[in-house]
Every structure is written in C-alpha cells, then in structure tokens.
Amino acid sequence: MRDAYVESLNELSQDMMQLAQIVETTIANTWTALESLDNKLASEIYHGNEDINTRVRECMKKDLTISLMQTPVATDWRHLMATQKILYDIERITDNCADICHYIFHLNKEGGPVTPPTGLQEMYQVMASMVVDVLRLYNEGGIDDIDLIRDKDDIVDMAFTKSMEEISEKMVKEPNHVRQYISYVLIVKYIERMADHASNITDWILYRSNNMLK
C-alpha cells in the first residue's frame, strides 16, 4: 500500500514538472506573438489552452485522489493542499496567455499598428521570470528567492500604473486609435494578473514548507 502511495506522489510530481515546462513555453510564445502581432501563433496558443486546462484538471484529480484515498501524512497533506491551490493559479496564468492572444486578434483587426506602451517588454519579462522562478521553487521543494519574487511583483505593479497613464495620454492624442489602445489596456492588465498569480504561488509554497514569513 505504501509503495502505491509513493508511486502516486512521484507520478504527480512528474506531471507537475511537465506542466511547468508547458507553461514556460506558452508564456514565451505569447510574448513572441504579442511582439510580432503574429495571428497564426496567437491562434495556436489560444486554441491550445484547453489542452493545458485538461492537463491541469488531470493533476487536480490525481492530487485529490491521493488526498482522499491514500491517507497522506501531515507533511504530504500540506504539499497536496498547496499543489491544488497552485494548480488553480497555473490555470489562470495560461488562461491569461489565451486572453492576450485574443486581443492580438483585435489589434490586427482594427487597422494599422500603434506603438505599444513603453516598457511593455520589460514588464512582460519580469512577470515571466516570476512564473519560471515559482515553478522551479515548487518542483525543487525550496523557498529561496521568495522575497525577490515578491519584489518583482512590485516592479510589475509599478510598470502597470505607468503603462495605464501612458495609454490614457495616447488615447487623447490619437482618438482614431482608441480601440487599439483599449486592447493594450487589457493586455497590460492580464500581464499584471499573471504576476499576481505567480505571487500567490509563493504563498502556497511557504504554506507547504510550514515556514510562513512574518
């Protein structure tokens, strides 16, 4: 019975590592699509999101099965509980990638391109590094760099505020391009949300470690 329990935990761990790789690739490809306004790549990401959600739900099901059927010890229970919550944030992160791709379609549909907000690439890269770092910490079982990840979330928040101000000014100066700038408002908001979800994952990593920061 114990062997089956350990095997189930190992299988879930392998699934989570594979999911992390898929998430990292999706985030990287989403930026490529956004930077180049590549409708084809955006469509692949948008329509492929359901496959990622299916993987997430499969991991959730395995996690719940272990929690309910295998009688985990206290340490493992905290790990399983944290994994369930982390999976929700992972699903939302990839949903936001699909959301961004949806607005790439809008940017292309509304006519000629407009200049994206200053610092958009840097904002996206900081967010992407947060996701990569938290998934690495989850899979490696550590809590190093938690404070650094949270500091990055503050950087994304500041970039979000600055971008909103810049887009508002451009809407006034270029009223013919308001629809495109609205798309950028939503894109920037999704990036900010992705960083928030990454920050949420740090809380559950700390919960799992039973070493919450004061």
Where are the predicted features?
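Cytosolic, long alpha-helical scaffolding segments
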Residues: 1-214
